[in-house]
Amino acid sequence: MANSSLSNADIKHLKGIGHQLNPVVMIGGQGVTPTVIEEIGRALNDHELIKVKIPAGSKADRDAVANAIAEATDAILVTSIGRMVLLVRHNPEANPKLSNLARFG
C-alpha cells in the first residue's frame, strides 16, 4: 500500500521516529515467505511502526518486495531507503510500552 494516505507532515514525523529504530525483521535468502509475513504482522501489532531489512537486489526488486510486504500485511509503506523499509499500521489496542508511536511520538 503506498503512502498516499499519509500527509507529508505525517511522513516526515514517522521518518524521524523510524531513524532511531533498528530493524525488527530481516528477510533472508528464502525471501518473503508466509512465516515472514506473519512475523511482520505480529511486529506491526505490537510496535505499529517498524523497520524491515530486505534482501539486496535492484531498486525495482527492492521496491517490489517492499510493496508486496505492505500489501500482505495491510500496512502503509512510509519509505524505502536502500535495503531498509519503514512500515506503519495503526493499532488502537497497542501496548503503549511497546508501540514506537506512543514511545517516540
Description of each model-found segment:
Residues 2-105:
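Positively charged, polar, low-complexity stretches
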